[in-house]
Design a protein with these regions (language model features):
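N-terminal secretory signal peptides that target proteins for export/translocation
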Residues: 1-2
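Sec-dependent N-terminal signal peptides of Gram-positive bacterial secreted proteins and lipoproteins
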Residues: 5-24
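A residue-level marker of the well-folded mature domains of exported/periplasmic proteins
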Residues: 25-397
Length: 397
């Protein structure tokens, strides 16, 4: 075969291969199969927010709803492993899981199916797992918590001015799920936001030891109100706390979704994550056949976090303008949520802090978290690692 003929055949073969690659990419978009393992279902805010985010990402990428398989109400037990295996056996190309306790079970499945991408929300172990197909993702929700705290602080000021209570009685109640860093980071950010506009504010935190239990969250909110808390917020997944607030006439700030439908006369706003940001990122990489980072975290500047609509008839005058000001300051980097000049620990300013534990002994051993005078949250990994107990916040039984 002469060289000219060989070159022509080689060129034709290259063109054919290029068409096959393009065709495969197009088919992948139409045939990709996605799994989502959920701690709850569409009836609770946290999971509903994930479902809505995945649906939005799929719609934007031209992926049909029939290509997504959901595993609802999956507990943080061996059931999560079984769900992951079942999704893998059903041919999923990428599997997402949305609860902290799913992680070890999902990554166990990732070891068995290296050709499938496993993406876990709120977890901490992907980078240390050594698995190229294991990923953690979260968002800088502490930024939105801070903004929601500003909304709350302005409401406290309004109620103080109206004579409903004194400045010294401006006590916030916070219904937390577990005493984990994820929750601690959130309630601390919320408190700092509130105190930035209402300096006399204090806060009590009560844990339910459950991510989503409507009755326990309602009871916790009721107990905090009975203990003198005049505004309630939450890091818990149901409408339990807002329901208690609506019955008691106490203002509240929610999480995940707007709580105005559940508490139209008391809900101010909610801090929320735009999960579509990550779902789109991960799906685009899977569709392209590209490997992607083990950790992902984005915030206000990327549109990954926000506060839901303000209850205009209830929030204090000037709240919308203040929110816009604070959001812009966070985006342009002139406001750092965990500025060490704004809080103390046992009366002392924090100048150094080891970020988090890598060997499981619950003693932080990796990474300096204090950078340029602020605690740099979710930089060394996607999940929060703010573990400080700052002055002004008290835990209650």
């Amino acid at each position: 075969m002469n060289m000219k003929k060989f070159a022509s055949l080689l060129l034709a073969l290259c063109m054919l291969l290029s068409m096959v690659v393009v065709a495969n990419a197009e088919v992948a978009a139409n045939e990709i199969k996605i799994g989502l393992i959920c701690i709850g279902d569409e009836n609770e805010g946290y999971t509903a927010n994930h479902i809505n985010g995945l649906r939005a990402a799929c719609a934007e990428l031209g992926i049909d709803a029939s290509q997504v398989i959901y595993k609802y109400n999956t507990p943080e037990t061996e059931a999560a492993y079984e769900a992951a295996i079942d999704l893998a056996e059903q041919g999923c190309d990428v599997i997402f899981a949305n609860s902290f306790g799913h992680e070890s079970y999902v990554f166990l499945a990732a070891e068995e199916y290296p050709e499938i991408e496993f993406c876990h929300a709120t977890g901490t172990g992907a980078s240390a797992s050594g698995l190229e197909n294991a990923h953690n993702f979260f968002a800088a929700i502490y930024e939105a918590r801070y903004v929601a705290g500003v909304v709350a602080g302005m409401k406290l000021n309004e109620m103080i001015a109206e004579g409903k209570f004194t400045a010294e009685q401006a006590k916030i109640g916070y219904v937390g799920a577990f005493p984990f860093e994820e929750v601690k980071s959130g309630y601390t950010a919320f408190y700092l936001g509130a105190r930035s506009v209402c300096p006399s504010a204090t806060m009590e935190v009560k844990f339910t030891n459950s991510w989503g239990d409507l009755a326990l969250e309602k009871e916790a909110a009721e107990a905090l109100i009975a203990n003198g808390c005049v505004l309630i917020s939450q890091h818990a997944d149901t409408t339990g706390a807002p329901t208690a607030c609506e019955a008691a006439g106490v203002p509240c700030v929610g999480y995940n979704i707007s709580m105005i439908p559940a508490a139209p006369n008391t809900a101010l706003t909610s801090a929320a994550i735009n999960w579509a940001s990550y779902f789109k990122f991960a799906l685009q990489n899977v569709l392209a056949g590209e490997k992607f980072a083990s950790d992902w975290c984005q915030g206000y500047v990327d549109g990954a976090v926000y506060i839901t609509e303000l209850n205009e008839g209830l929030v204090a005058e000037g709240t919308a303008a203040k929110v816009a000001e604070i959001e812009e300051a966070i985006k342009n980097g002139t406001l750092h949520v965990f500025n060490t000049a704004t809080f103390t620990v046992k009366g002392e300013t924090v100048t150094t802090c080891t970020a988090y534990d890598t060997d499981g002994d619950y003693v932080p051993d990796f990474g300096e978290a204090i950078v340029d005078g602020y605690f740099a949250e979710s930089v060394l990994r996607s999940a929060p690692y703010f573990g400080l107990d700052i002055d002004g916040i008290t835990m209650v039984e």
